[in-house]
């Protein structure tokens, strides 16, 4: 799929209604918000780095969405996108993040000691635990918009920072372009590496340009702390391990992430953050904490229960298939994670996962014995 809004200035030769995209068959947040009037109002605006409204919406125009899955349908190209195009982004953010208003403030809490429990999820059911987030480096444009030189500068800065980590975080960087096909596939299968850029969302937004130039993965020596460089975000920071010790996974996540943040600050490149949106990331769905705390959990009986979906909704959790977004569950193993990102803290979001998964495992055990779980259905969180 070709990408390029290089003729944005040229588009202004045509009337706004002649350029307005056909969104009649679309089911995404952008299409819900973008009226012809709003398009007209914003189409000649651009951010200081030159990102325009057409750049913001292209991925949502090319990917109408799914009848049952509401995609976001837009991206930011730089930190200023959320301000310059706030008339589009604010209603999308409010819709996507449970009514989070333009006046609301986000809260951050990376003190792992505030998490209660989490070290006792039953490993017979909980096969692995992971926490991830994204970070954007101030002073650079985001992946949908950055140039080759800029992307390489982000990689250089990131590798220098990561290579200075010590102790349990000591590790090594592996650039994508020097990996063999086999090495890449092995890392993807082990859930360590991002997939090749075949996702239409990635392609249509321009994030896959120049692939695999300046992309790579850094991980510590025992592969429990990983950083992806220059995929959908400048950095994706991941803490993971087999089994159900979410407490330890979250501790390593918080400690490692704060170490990295400190190094970037000292280098004069703090992460993009503001008190309204929290951590600023490429996709509006990740604003706030950018955090997804997830477990792979085996729920052979509960997943067939008529109230499974309702239970997840009430616990503020979401399910994905075993291989992540848009994949099926293999052997009744689901990827269960927090549904929220914005308006609540990292600790609160992981707490919901820990408490919710614990309850679902108890339910699964009851159903195995042929007992009813009706008295265990939780109230809406």
UniProtKB/Swiss-Prot annotation:
Residues 125-367 form the Phosphagen kinase C-terminal domain. Pfam families: ATP-gua_Ptrans, ATP-gua_PtransN. It catalyses: creatine + ATP = N-phosphocreatine + ADP + H(+). ATP binds at residues 128-132, 191, 236, 292, 320-325. Residues 11-98 form the Phosphagen kinase N-terminal domain. The keyword rRNA-binding does not apply. Keywords: ATP-binding, Kinase, Nucleotide-binding, Phosphoprotein, Transferase. The modification Phosphothreonine is found at residues 166, 180, 313, 322. Transmembrane segments: none annotated. GO terms for biological process: phosphocreatine biosynthetic process; response to heat. GO terms for molecular function: ATP binding; creatine kinase activity. The modification Phosphoserine is found at residues 164, 178, 199, 372. Its EC number is 2.7.3.2. One of its GO terms (cellular component) is extracellular space. Dimer of identical or non-identical chains, which can be either B (brain type) or M (muscle type). With MM being the major form in skeletal muscle and myocardium, MB existing in myocardium, and BB existing in many tissues, especially brain. Belongs to the ATP:guanido phosphotransferase family. Reversibly catalyzes the transfer of phosphate between ATP and various phosphogens (e.g. creatine phosphate). Creatine kinase isoenzymes play a central role in energy transduction in tissues with large, fluctuating energy demands, such as skeletal muscle, heart, brain and spermatozoa. This is Creatine kinase M-type. The lineage of its organism: Eukaryota, Metazoa, Chordata, Craniata, Vertebrata. The gene is CKM.
């Amino acid at each position: 799929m070709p990408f390029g809004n290089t003729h944005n200035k040229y588009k202004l030769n045509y009337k706004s209604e002649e350029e307005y995209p056909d969104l009649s068959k679309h089911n995404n947040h952008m299409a819900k918000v973008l009226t012809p009037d709003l398009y007209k109002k914003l189409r000649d605006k651009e951010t200081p780095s030159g990102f325009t409204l057409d750049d913001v919406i292209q991925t949502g125009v090319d990917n109408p969405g799914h009848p049952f899955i509401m995609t976001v349908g837009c991206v930011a190209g730089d930190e200023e996108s959320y301000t310059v195009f706030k008339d589009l982004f604010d209603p999308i953010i409010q819709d996507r993040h449970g009514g989070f208003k333009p006046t609301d403030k986000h809260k951050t809490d990376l003190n792992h000691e505030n998490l209660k429990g989490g070290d006792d999820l039953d490993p017979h059911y909980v096969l692995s635990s992971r926490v991830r987030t994204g970070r954007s480096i101030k002073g650079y444009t985001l992946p949908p918009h950055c140039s080759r030189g800029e992307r390489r500068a982000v990689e250089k800065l990131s590798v220098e920072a990561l290579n200075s980590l010590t102790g349990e975080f000591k590790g090594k960087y592996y650039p994508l372009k020097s990996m063999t096909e086999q090495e890449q596939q092995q890392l993807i299968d082990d859930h360590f590496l991002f997939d090749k850029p075949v996702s239409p969302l990635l392609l249509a937004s321009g994030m896959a340009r120049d692939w695999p130039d300046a992309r790579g993965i850094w991980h510590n020596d025992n592969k429990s702390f990983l950083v992806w460089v220059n995929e959908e975000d400048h950095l994706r920071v991941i803490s993971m391990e087999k089994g159900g010790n979410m407490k330890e996974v979250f501790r390593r996540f918080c400690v490692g992430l704060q170490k990295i943040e400190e190094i970037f600050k000292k280098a004069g490149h703090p992460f993009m953050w503001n008190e309204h949106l929290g951590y600023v990331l490429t996709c509006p769905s990740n604003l706030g904490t950018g955090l997804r705390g997830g477990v792979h959990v085996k729920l052979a009986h509960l997943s067939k229960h008529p109230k499974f979906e309702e239970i997840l909704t009430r616990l503020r959790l979401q399910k994905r298939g075993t291989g992540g977004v848009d994949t099926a569950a293999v052997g009744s193993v689901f990827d269960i994670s927090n549904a929220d990102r914005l308006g609540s803290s990292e600790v609160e979001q992981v707490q919901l996962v820990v408490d919710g998964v614990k309850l679902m495992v108890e339910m699964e055990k009851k159903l195995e014995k042929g007992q009813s779980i009706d008295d265990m259905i939780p109230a809406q969180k």
